Amino acid sequence: MENLQVKALPKEFLLGTATAAYQVEGATRVDGKGINMWDVYLQENSPFLPDPASDFYYRYEEDIALAAEHGLQALRLSISWVRIFPDIDGDANVLAVHYYHRVFQSCLKHNVIPFVSLHHFDSPQKMLETGDWLNRENIDRFIRYARFCFQEFTEVKHWFTINELMSLAAGQYIGGQFPPNHHFQLSEAIQANHNMLLAHALAVLEFHQLGIEGKVGCIHALKPGYPIDGQKENILAAKRYDVYNNKFLLDGTFLGYYSEDTLFHLNQILEANNSSFIIEDGDLEIMKRAAPLNTMFVMNYYRSEFIREYKGENRQEFNSTGIKGQSSFKLNALGEFVKKPGIPTTDWDWNIYPQGLFDMLLRIKEEYPQHPVIYLTENGTALKEVKPEGENDIIDDSKRIRYIEQHLHKVLEARDRGVNIQGYFIWSLQDQFSWANGYNKRYGLFFVDYETQKRYIKKSALWVKGLKRN
């Protein structure tokens, strides 16, 4: 690893790591927790169950201490909506409220700053049954939940409303890996995204109206799309993909409306798939009021895509095994994902392309100059790892170190070019339950033996600990 370029970080730059409630907590039937959409779906359809997952519900103190001991200054985590409100229209669960206070206080005790998401892919089952984000009545339910958390957990100073809007909508209504498992329903996917942007805007307005101390934003998983070559049709396909996956969300967040260019290309995709979405009267006024009140911009980045024009039947193959070459994506009028020679991929077919992160950061600076401070709250790579033989053995995950270092280098390079990015969070703190892959897809800085729940240190954790400060 002697060729690594990142050996130190700016003194004021925040280095953190991340988790999500349903992927780490376990304890899915403990202390009055309600039922979310995954509890039902996984029980009926999956060989993998998220209990005990990483047992964070009981081991949070150990995991937060590990983060602090290895130089991590912040932890992104989420609150389980159905722990706080087992019945989304009912009363708050005191046991859950006390639990999350203990978690946040543990963070502060260890000098680890909590960054907290309200919704991380885990809608209540009752919300799913009533249309999830397609039903605007559920926006009101979300605002009630957000208001309670903003006012209750005053020790939290960094709030995220919704995590990865497009990833959620695409998983539910395009690829079908997430409940309700619909396929290529473009109307539903885009409508859900718009409604989530509206819900986010209303939550931001609520945050400021309540006079809450701290910062608030939402999290977008941004994936740049590059034409596979210089042919005009592939350039246009990459443009449409970018509007669908990135620009639609960025416009809605930072402008509070969708630009003419965004709507033109989005409507091309929708019309080709006999789809549409509705912007109701008053939506854009709310979004415009909220846009300048976002006090941080939060993005996740894992990969970029290389695009070729595609006109035909919609098809997607999802790689759930980690055997390379099993994934594919073809969406009429949007494009086809293709591999570019020389660009490495993970075992799950994700392109490893740090330049895409740099390009996206520069683009945000140039196209949305009004953006607030940026935090990159997920970046990391999955590996297939096995339990070490010795109790104190260190797991060699040099590939992860290389991945993190390459992307962190691009973040620091973007800072040098004037991008106001002040933090980088590694996904993930410990190995976790994966929504669609179960337990063989390991992202953690710390290995979890799921049978005993023992934590083993990986080399990546030691590399992070060894980073110096300028």
From Swiss-Prot:
- So which domain of life are we looking at? Bacteria
Write the Enzyme Commission number(s) for this entry.
3.2.1.85
Q: What is the lineage of its organism?
A: Bacteria, Bacillati, Bacillota, Bacilli, Lactobacillales
Active-site residues, as the UniProt record annotates them? 164, 378
Reaction catalysis annotation: a 6-phospho-beta-D-galactoside + H2O = D-galactose 6-phosphate + an alcohol
Question: What are the annotated GO cellular component locations?
Answer: cytosol
Q: In which family does this protein belong, per the annotation?
A: Belongs to the glycosyl hydrolase 1 family.
List, alphabetically, the PANTHER family matched: GLYCOSYL HYDROLASE (PTHR10353), LP05116P (PTHR10353:SF36)
Q: Which UniProt keywords apply?
A: Glycosidase, Hydrolase
Q: Which GO terms describe its molecular function?
A: 6-phospho-beta-galactosidase activity; beta-glucosidase activity
Q: Which HAMAP family match?
A: LacG
Q: Name one GO biological process term.
A: lactose catabolic process via tagatose-6-phosphate
- Pathway assignment: Carbohydrate metabolism; lactose degradation; D-galactose 6-phosphate and beta-D-glucose from lactose 6-phosphate: step 1/1
Q: Where does D-galactose 6-phosphate bind?
A: 23, 120, 163-164, 300, 434-435, 441, 443
Organism expressing this protein natively: Streptococcus pneumoniae (strain ATCC BAA-255 / R6)
- Asked whether the keyword Hydrolase is assigned, the reply is yes
Q: What class of enzyme is it?
A: hydrolase
Q: What is this protein called?
A: 6-phospho-beta-galactosidase 1
